[in-house]
Each structure stands twice: as structure tokens, then as C-alpha cells.
């Protein structure tokens, strides 16, 4: 790679992530003593979840809706709980049984099955929520705005390649003084903090690992992972 490789700044990106071994400047490495390799592998998506949590600016006693209970949504949910949220609603398809169960385990007060009820029709305790964390497709941003109380914040992440244009009622945003905020993290910057949160027991990432597989089994393992909608959460490649 040349001498310039040693001069790269923190957070650099280059091909080699799936190599069995890689040479990386010591200044770019973060120790994860006291954690398993499986837990350490989740620090990248956890950094994404942390940026979403910070973008939402959750305050004490806020009511929070987590829209989408994949690994990032479930980690952000735990952070919202630790950050002082009064009540947490988690929205997900009823077919994603494992995700819904973990949402309950991590502190969700109510689970909303979005394939059975429209969010706009759900009876929220305060009529709506103060913050919405959107990890579902961006097209749901309009729905998120519709269930926000006055002064609410909708924070979202995710890239939509097929439907990047979203629609929402501008009057709802204007009259209710809502904010729509995008989250785009540089996860590596949060690695030390995320490691501390896991070690302190504030965020449980071990429960998110639903599948493990070795490198040589990647094609078949990933195919099975995508077929297993009921229990699939996070797949981690390991070396036995």
C-alpha cells in the first residue's frame, strides 16, 4: 500500500475488511479486552445506533417510538431507555417474532404490529410520541411525522436505492413544529464509547447474534439467514 498508508487519519476506509489478516496502523486500533469477538463485531452497527440516538436528542420523560426493530433499532431502543425515556413503543411486523421479543426484553413498554394496525390509528397514551427513531425504510418518515406530538423530532437513517424520494404532510410538520433529522454516522469514532456501554451492561449486544458461521460456509449461511425471517437478527462470521 505504500508509506502513505501509515499516515491515514482515523476513520479511513479501504478494502480488506474480509481478509483473514490485515495490517493496520496501531493508532487506528481499539482494544476490546473483556469482550467476545462476537460482541466486538457489533461495535460498528452499534456506533450507527448511537449516532441515531444522539440525533434524536431524547430527553428525560420523553415518549419514544422505535420504528423498525432490527439490530440497530434494538440497540437504539436500549439507549433510549438508559437515556430516560418515559415510555417506549416498538413497531415491527408480527412475523419478526425474535425481534419483538427482544424489544420487550430491552425495555419496550408496548409492541405495535404494523401489519395489523396503522400507526396513525394506534392509541398512544399521550396521543402521539415526542421522538421517533426510524430504522425502517425512509418511506415511513411521513407516517412517523403523523404520530409525533407538538415539538417532536423524527430521526432516521438508512439509504433507499429504489425509492429515495419520500412524502410527508408539510402542514403537519409546520403546524406541529416538528423536526426531521438525518443520521449518518462514522461508527469507528464511537467504538471506545460503545465498548464502555457494553461492558457497563447498559447495552446488550450478545442477544442480537442469532447466527454464526465460518468463512467457508458464507454463501449457504447467508442464504439461510435471509430465509429465516422469524429468528434472524445479526449474523457474525467466526473462526472456529
Provide a role label for each language-model segment.
Residues 1-29:
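Glycine-rich phosphate/adenylate-binding loop and adjacent beta-alpha elements
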Residues 27-38, 176-177:
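Glycine/charged-rich beta-loop-alpha catalytic/anionic-binding loops adjacent to active sites
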Amino acid at each position: 500500500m505504500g508509506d502513505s498508508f501509515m499516515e491515514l487519519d482515523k476513520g479511513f476506509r479501504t478494502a480488506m475488511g474480509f481478509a483473514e489478516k490485515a495490517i493496520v496502523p496501531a493508532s487506528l486500533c481499539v482494544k476490546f479486552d473483556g469482550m467476545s469477538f462476537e460482541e466486538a463485531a457489533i461495535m460498528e452497527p452499534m456506533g450507527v445506533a448511537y449516532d441515531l440516538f444522539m440525533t434524536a436528542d431524547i430527553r428525560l420523560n420523553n415518549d419514544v417510538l422505535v420504528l423498525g426493530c432490527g439490530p440497530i433499532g434494538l440497540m437504539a431502543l436500549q439507549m433510549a431507555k438508559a437515556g430516560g425515556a418515559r415510555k417506549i413503543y416498538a413497531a415491527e411486523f408480527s412475523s419478526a417474532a425474535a425481534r419483538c421479543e427482544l424489544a420487550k426484553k430491552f425495555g419496550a413498554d408496548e409492541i405495535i404490529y404494523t401489519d395489523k394496525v396503522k400507526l396513525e390509528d394506534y392509541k398512544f397514551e399521550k396521543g402521539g410520541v415526542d421522538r421517533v427513531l426510524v430504522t425502517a425504510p425512509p418511506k415511513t418518515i411521513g407516517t412517523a411525522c403523523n404520530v409525533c406530538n407538538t415539538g417532536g423530532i423524527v430521526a432516521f437513517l438508512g439509504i433507499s436505492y429504489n425509492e429515495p424520494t419520500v412524502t410527508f404532510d408539510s402542514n403537519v410538520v409546520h403546524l406541529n413544529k416538528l423536526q426531521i433529522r438525518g443520521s449518518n454516522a462514522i461508527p469507528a469514532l464511537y467504538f471506545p464509547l460503545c465498548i464502555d456501554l457494553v461492558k457497563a451492561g447498559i447495552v446488550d449486544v450478545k442477544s442480537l447474534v442469532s447466527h454464526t458461521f465460518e468463512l467457508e460456509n458464507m454463501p449457504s449461511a447467508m442464504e439461510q439467514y435471509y430465509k429465516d425471517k422469524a429468528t434472524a437478527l445479526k449474523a457474525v462470521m467466526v473462526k472456529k
